Amino acid sequence: MAEEKKSHIIFGRLDIPFEVKDVAKFPGYAAVFGPGIIWAGLSQGSGELIWWPYLVSKYGLWFMAWMPIWAILQWWYNQELGRYTLATGESVYDGFMRIHFIWGWVCFAFAVIMFSWVGGYQGAAASAMTAITKFPPGWDTKSQVRFWMVLLNIITWLIVMFGPVAYRVVEVIETLAAIASFFGMLAAVLATPEVLAVGGKFFASFLSLKVNPAIPILPKVPPNWDVADTAVLITSITYTGAGGIWNTGYSFWVRDGNWGQAAHVGRVTSPLTGKPEAIPSVGVAFEATPENIAEWKKWVRTLWLDNLFGVLFNMFTIVWTAWLSYGILHPAGLTPKGWQLVTVQGEWFAKAFGEPGRIVMLLLGFFFLFDIQFTAGDLMSRIVSDYAYVGLKGRVKSIPKTVILMYIWLAIFILPLSIGAPATFALYVVYLFVVSLLMAYSAIHDWEYRKIYYSFFTLFIIVGCIQIFLKSPATLILSTGILNMAVQAIFCTSLLVLNWYVLPKIHPAGKEVRPSWITFILLLFSTIMWWYCTAWYIQVRLG
């Protein structure tokens, strides 16, 4: 493989040609099943458990007809994320660097913002365990939650470090979480007469699409609409799926699942229990021979199927949680926020089914949320590893200069958002320096991919444990929820450029790897939808 790197780290683009090998033989769907359900499991952590039930409990069924539309729009986004990896064995972030390095580094900054407040991901799961166990005894609730947050972070680190293959760890955890959440909530619905009694009205609402008269691709808001809930609605739209940056994990899971040309690329394996696998700095393409095209089409059809499975699995989970909220919370006029949605329903189940009912509901909430830390740490570690291993390696010679440039770039995006929380601001000053130093040092000293990955995953967990004891930066948390909608629009636009224009020019198979016109149009529609939603939110907030 050609390793000479001539392009400028800022003003050039990733231009190393692909290695060329035949398309990997398709082994059957059962052998590669995984990325779709991982995506579904991740998606269940916020929109499905928190935001959609909140909207239903407060506004009834006003928005439900829009939910399947927003869910299906995630399909085209995922499909093109997976297509690039299927054709090249590279992550989509490598593709963004092939568009241009400046664009690649902008996308990297978006990712760092999204994963900056890592301590919060275990908060709700820890709250569930505190409510169930009341452990440690004698401690106040806040201290108990912090204890469980630290413990869950340590458990997360140990599982990932000792799991032989990082992807398999995430796959198992997310699959268990997705199945427990899906069937647990379905069982809760079926076991509750009050919920079943409103089933007819609930499902009839899917046929009542209330359209914004000014912008038909946006929903009309109800008469009692609270403008402050605009951010909730936008977040619900984005998280009718994983959302924004989170969706890009699908590209990595396709890669480590050995799909298509990724079968020629090694996986991330544990330095403690796994055997090292070679991970090249650039991907592997194929020529347009009849045999290769036949195999390629099998992989693409499987990508469609796997992606559809994840979208539908996630969509029906939203149906169960929204139905439960409509049957229990809405009639009582209860509109609790965040984790309170589950605890309130847990108390209702305690009245109906006794203490076991409350515990079951809290356990379901735990399964919804515990898995997020695994996937967040895995995804951020992969993104950092890609930029250090592919973007910096072989292109930088000075650690101080590289650290300074990286630090300034990241600080511009992150530090202003943490103003108002002095201790957190101080932590981020140090954190961004360590990230920059780790990336520069690993690139110059030729670290292997997995060494970068596990080093950053460890840093991710350490920072998460520290953040538990700090004041959360409200500006950052609010910004990330809205930023993800903008990122979804930006990344969809990037995929239109990458897969329709750039990929056919640099791939030996040319137009054979380009999406069809139908796919292009559907992704274009999705992109317009995300841009309109972003603009609408800005307009509403500015008055």
Label every PLM stretch briefly.
Residues F11-P17, W51-V56, N78-I102, A126-P137, ...:
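Flexible loop linkers connecting adjacent transmembrane helices
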Residues G36, P136-F162, I179-L186, V396-I412, ...:
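Transmembrane alpha-helical segments of multi-pass small-molecule transport proteins
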Residues P136, I154-A177, F183, A187-L196, ...:
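Membrane-water interface regions at transmembrane-helix termini and the short interhelical loops
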